[in-house]
């Protein structure tokens, strides 16, 4: 398959972007790791698992076991998708993996179906529990009953299914790249605030220092925009489009590593300085 990918892969700019030696692609991939990690720190599903663990050792063992199982699976899936795209026979990137296994052993498909259904059920279960927890604690602060929160979560499912069908609402098209852009914006919000929130567990961090840290997270991204200004956008647009040159993800913009790094580091430094300068009374 690798030989086929090399044979079909054209020698142009897109070939450069797909090269392992091209640092732009590597930085974009690393940026996604940083962005998703920051966003997952706010996931109620993860913290529910932490709370439900028997002890620290069980939590540590479960984390390492999950990582050992997930990493090779994600690596293989991503690699096979890249190989399929390199062969040039896939018009829709979402079916690249299935293009590769089209002529494989007939036992592969049933195994993959079971795996995919299991993954979807697990993700949906975690997501729904997290939404219920967010309604109950974060949004209503315990005012809404658990039953009401569950009903509200179930009521969101038809809207989610409708949005997944790819509609166009007020001129915005809900396709894969557009939704990816929404996720990047959400990840930027998380990256700018995750350091102050987690550092609040440290007793010396004050509430005003944490608040200033959150503001500094966004200011750091804007400062990065002044140092590396986007070609066709304002310097602050990295907050909305954290991609190379602030090009929207729907137009092919690659994730910008340094926008996320500046948000995390800037917010952390401002939190520490602000906490010492403005301690809680």
Question: Language-model segments: what does each one mean?
Answer:
Residues 1-281:
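Membrane-embedded helix-loop-helix hairpins and adjacent transmembrane boundary segments
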